[in-house]
């Protein structure tokens, strides 16, 4: 094993100490729960500063780990990291989060064997794989307890999201190299073919597959995406809807069953909302006095001409650039340059060198690549995409949640130059 660079290791240890100090100061400055939006099971969403500082600590710890492991063990550990997901997938499938008691006394392996019907040997190895990642804990031989992370598996949305990640995403990842060979490394213009379609059905993209073939996985996906929504800032926390004139029309493009529009309409009753989505999505949803449901395919020209706002929340990250150009072009043709704007409510990844980026953001980006040919975009990549749509279209402003300026989530306001 190669001895680590002593000077580099000492320097990183000092960096880590300083980063932890800064992080604790930032965390202490949180005066009350009201300073943050509370999300899943009382877990608060950290401020953008706290979030960034936390990931700096994680990155420094990883750099220390790479040094002390040495290059070959570090390389192999990363190559085999999917085995952690395999153990976590088994744990969630067996519902170990419900079998293991959250209380003062641990749960015995015998109890888990009786509840699951799985052998002692396999359960030990599954739980060992999880516990090494601080998901469950063996507090005494064959005695298991919860950790903060494993408790979160009891939350429906998180359990579903983990299931999706360890099933559809992991299967799709196994086909990524096949996908690159088949497409010669050129991204398709829409969702098929994709690593997901190669893994599940070569003729169908993820959403089509869920709606026509596998409704069980589809329901789990919906629950999981609901869990992620709880961690994102609300669009009305970023964009000031009260600034729109009385009677303005907001078109919620790809707005699902209208949950967002109904929520915002209750806070801003002076506005009129039109929710557009596919017939199967909006089927059975009734109009209200402020919210109208409309059948629409984003691959067609938008039928609502001259609306004040065309809102897209978490839509474009599901598609490659060519598809996004088509989607936005179909809106641009309907815009009134004198008043219309497009609001893109999406993740905005920081423009950083690869090794300085946040691993979790990269994992989200790779998730949409593998399952949808999608893409999480940086400021530079968003600007490049917008330029491809129409040379008149430009980003006029980015709206952030108060106190979160420059964070990883914002609302980009696009207008046509007159």
From Swiss-Prot:
GO BP: any one term: aflatoxin biosynthetic process
Record-annotated active site: 317 (proton acceptor)
Pfam families membership: Dimerisation, Methyltransf_2
Catalysis performed (reactions): sterigmatocystin + S-adenosyl-L-methionine = 8-O-methylsterigmatocystin + S-adenosyl-L-homocysteine + H(+); dihydrosterigmatocystin + S-adenosyl-L-methionine = 8-O-methyldihydrosterigmatocystin + S-adenosyl-L-homocysteine + H(+)
EC number(s) from the headed UniProt entry: 2.1.1.110
Gene transcribed to yield this protein: omtA
Entry annotated with the keyword Transcription: no
Segments crossing the lipid bilayer: none
Main enzyme class: transferase
GO MF, any single term: sterigmatocystin 7-O-methyltransferase activity
Pathway assigned in UniProt: Mycotoxin biosynthesis; aflatoxin biosynthesis
Entry's family note: Belongs to the class I-like SAM-binding methyltransferase superfamily. Cation-independent O-methyltransferase family. COMT subfamily.
Protein's UniProt keywords contain Methyltransferase: yes
Region (Substrate binding): 206-225
Organism of origin: Aspergillus flavus (strain ATCC 200026 / FGSC A1120 / IAM 13836 / NRRL 3357 / JCM 12722 / SRRC 167)
Residues reported to bind S-adenosyl-L-methionine: 254-255, 277, 297-298, 313
Propeptide: 1-41
PANTHER family reported for this sequence: O-METHYLTRANSFERASE ASQN-RELATED, PUTATIVE (AFU_ORTHOLOGUE AFUA_4G14580)-RELATED
Protein name per UniProt: Sterigmatocystin 8-O-methyltransferase
Binding site for substrate: 170-176
Keywords: Methyltransferase, S-adenosyl-L-methionine, Transferase
Function text: Involved in the conversion of sterigmatocystin to O-methylsterigmatocystin (OMST) and dihydrosterigmatocystin to dihydro-o-methylsterigmatocystin in the aflatoxin biosynthesis pathway.
């Amino acid at each position: 094993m190669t001895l680590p660079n002593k000077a580099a290791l000492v320097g990183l240890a000092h960096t880590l100490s300083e980063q932890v100090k800064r992080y604790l100061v930032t965390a202490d400055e949180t005066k009350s729960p009201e300073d943050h939006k509370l999300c899943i099971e009382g877990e608060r969403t950290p401020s953008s500063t706290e979030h960034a500082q936390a990931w700096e600590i994680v990155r420094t710890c990883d750099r220390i780990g790479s040094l002390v492991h040495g290059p070959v063990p570090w390389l192999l550990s990363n190559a085999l990291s999917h085995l952690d997901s395999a153990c976590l997938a088994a744990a969630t499938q067996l519902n170990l989060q419900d079998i293991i008691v959250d209380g003062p006394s641990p749960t015995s392996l015998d109890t888990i064997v009786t509840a699951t019907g799985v052998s002692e040997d396999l359960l030990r190895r599954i739980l060992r794989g999880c516990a090494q990642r601080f998901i469950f804990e063996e507090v005494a031989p064959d005695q298991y307890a919860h950790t903060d992370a494993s408790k979160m598996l009891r939350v429906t949305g998180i359990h579903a999201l983990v299931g999706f990640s360890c099933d559809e995403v992991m299967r799709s990842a196994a086909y990524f190299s096949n996908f690159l060979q088949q497409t010669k490394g050129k991204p398709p213009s829409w969702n098929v073919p994709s690593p997901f379609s190669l893994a599940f059905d070569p003729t169908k993209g993820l959403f089509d597959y869920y709606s026509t073939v596998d409704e069980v996985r589809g329901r789990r996906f919906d629950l999981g995406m609901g869990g992620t929504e709880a961690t994102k800032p609300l669009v009305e926390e970023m964009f000031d809807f009260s600034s729109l004139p009385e009677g303005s029309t907001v078109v919620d493009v790809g707005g699902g069953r209208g949950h967002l529009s109904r929520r915002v309409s209750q806070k801003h009753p002076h506005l009129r909302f039109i929710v557009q989505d596919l017939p199967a999505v909006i089927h059975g949803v009734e109009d209200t006095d402020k919210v109208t449901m409309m059948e629409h395919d984003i691959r067609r020209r938008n039928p609502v001409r001259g609306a004040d706002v065309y809102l897209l929340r978490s839509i474009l990250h599901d598609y490659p650039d060519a598809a996004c150009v088509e989607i936005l072009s179909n809106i641009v043709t309907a815009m009134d340059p004198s008043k219309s704007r497009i609001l893109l409510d999406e993740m905005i990844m920081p423009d950083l060198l690869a090794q300085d980026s946040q691993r979790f953001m990269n994992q989200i980006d790779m998730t949409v690549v593998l399952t949808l040919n999608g893409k999480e975009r940086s400021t530079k990549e968003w600007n490049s995409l917008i330029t491809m749509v129409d040379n008149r279209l430009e980003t006029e402003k980015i709206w952030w949640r108060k106190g979160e300026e420059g964070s990883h989530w914002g609302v980009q306001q696009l207008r046509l130059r007159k």
